[in-house]
Amino acid sequence: MSIQVFCDFDGTITNNDNIMSIMEKFAPPEAEEVKNRILSQELSIQEGVSQLFQLIPTNLHDEIIQFLIETAEIRNGFHEFIQFVNENNISFYVISGGMDFFVYPLLQGLIPKEQIYCNETDFSNEYITVNWPHPCDRLCQNHCGLCKSSLIRKLSDTNDFHIVIGDSITDLQAAKQADKVFARDFLITKCEENHISYTPFETFHDVQTELKHLLEVKL
């Protein structure tokens, strides 16, 4: 049995949710209603996020990138946590509902690209189009967009010990099949609603301390 860590990006690795930051800065007012319909699960994540990015003109590409580089902050303890998982031969994957045009640049030098799974964007038309290279498999019908539970099934063995780290509704399906969940913000609410056991965290120092204890117990 090996330990596999599956970690969200927006609002988890970064302090802020970059998609929401983009919408607040660059989207028209109607984005707020779409966002609320996603959080209430009235819209699927795939449908809602597609609608949000269709509100953003592609000619803002460079401005958006510069904005995120200036404002996105990596959560405290993440660099040390990555060093810890590497030293302990723990498999680590970023499974993000975020977009390639900002996830890859913000993680450059920290995580190898082959360990990052995110959505793809097309800037060739007037408005941003989101492509979905990691859809739901036959065991999930939630129209997740990037399906985190499907990726967990694809990337790991059923005998592995699955750890999920996340913060929002987009991490719920993954949390349902995890052996251990580290949760913050809205994911805590959803875990409690669905009777999913979780460990709260605010920094990756918190996660590392708990994971170190877990390794000692399992060894």
Swiss-Prot record:
Molecular function per GO: 2-hydroxy-3-keto-5-methylthiopentenyl-1-phosphate phosphatase activity
E.C. designation(s): 3.1.3.87
Keyword Ribosomal protein part of the UniProt annotation: no
Domain of life: Bacteria
Keywords per UniProt: Amino-acid biosynthesis, Hydrolase, Methionine biosynthesis
Any matching Pfam family: HAD
Pathway it works in: Amino-acid biosynthesis; L-methionine biosynthesis via salvage pathway; L-methionine from S-methyl-5-thio-alpha-D-ribose 1-phosphate: step 4/6
Catalytic reaction list: 2-hydroxy-5-methylsulfanyl-3-oxopent-1-enyl phosphate + H2O = 1,2-dihydroxy-5-(methylsulfanyl)pent-1-en-3-one + phosphate
Entry's Gene Ontology BP terms: L-methionine salvage from methylthioadenosine
InterPro entries in the record: HAD-like_hydrolase_phosphatase (IPR050849), HAD-like_sf (IPR036412), HAD-SF_hydro_IB_MtnX (IPR017718), HAD_hydro_PyrdxlP_Pase-like (IPR006384), HAD_sf (IPR023214)
Role noted for this protein: Dephosphorylates 2-hydroxy-3-keto-5-methylthiopentenyl-1-phosphate (HK-MTPenyl-1-P) yielding 1,2-dihydroxy-3-keto-5-methylthiopentene (DHK-MTPene).
Protein family per UniProt: Belongs to the HAD-like hydrolase superfamily. MtnX family.
Protein name, entry field: 2-hydroxy-3-keto-5-methylthiopentenyl-1-phosphate phosphatase
Source species: Bacillus thuringiensis (strain Al Hakam)
The organism's taxonomic lineage, starting at the top: Bacteria, Bacillati, Bacillota, Bacilli, Bacillales
